[in-house]
Amino acid sequence: MTERLQKILSARGMASRRKAEELIRAGQVSVNGVTATLGDCADPETDDIRVAGQPLAVREKNVYILLNKPRGYVTTLSDEKGRPDVAGLVADCGERVYPVGRLDMDSEGLLLLTNDGAFANALMHPKHEVEKTYDVWVTGYMPGGERRLAKPITLDGYTIRPPKVKLLKAEGQSAKFRVTIHEGRNRQVRRMCDAAGMHCTRLRRIQEGSLRLGDLPLGKWRYLTEAEVAGLVQTPGTSGTI
């Protein structure tokens, strides 16, 4: 069955969908000896697909990993600035896995990694609206801060859906919230705090869809169970089946 090349490369764990598109544009991908262009399709079972002259990798077993990411790690597999990356934290899993979505360097908590490109792309697609829940520590809190934080704002030209906000603790101008969002805009929760007149000092993701961080130690990872993978495929907080 023919599929778009970037989807094939992603499904084989050779690159993320975006990176695969970059490789195709750079002329690094060929099909049956002919340099591919973006939009080309191929059959991975019958066509000779190569990346930088190397044949397409044999299909790997699907691996799904939950990492409790510490602060100070970038959510990439390598970093041109030499900063610590999450790849080093999961190197002993024995498979090349890719982060599902982003968690910025200054944030911590639940991060999914997998070599199942189709699963990752579906989970990240905006139409599924997978809910993500964070514990958020702020300074600059004033009474009513939770109501300001819960107001919809416009980020990057897009009006986000009103988040769910619960005040967990407040002492003077310091507070802790639990915030659930539906999108995944760049540094979204931190920018929401700024818009509400508060400064986010710590951010920890504790849940994505039906998957919870639980008591997994910081910097450690574990495999998802079959039930957890199935729960993400059909999870509360999505607009249908992934």
Kindly give the residue locations of the regions a language model identified.
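Basic, flexible Lys/Arg- and Gly-enriched helix-loop patches that mediate nucleic-acid binding at interfaces
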Residues: M1-I242
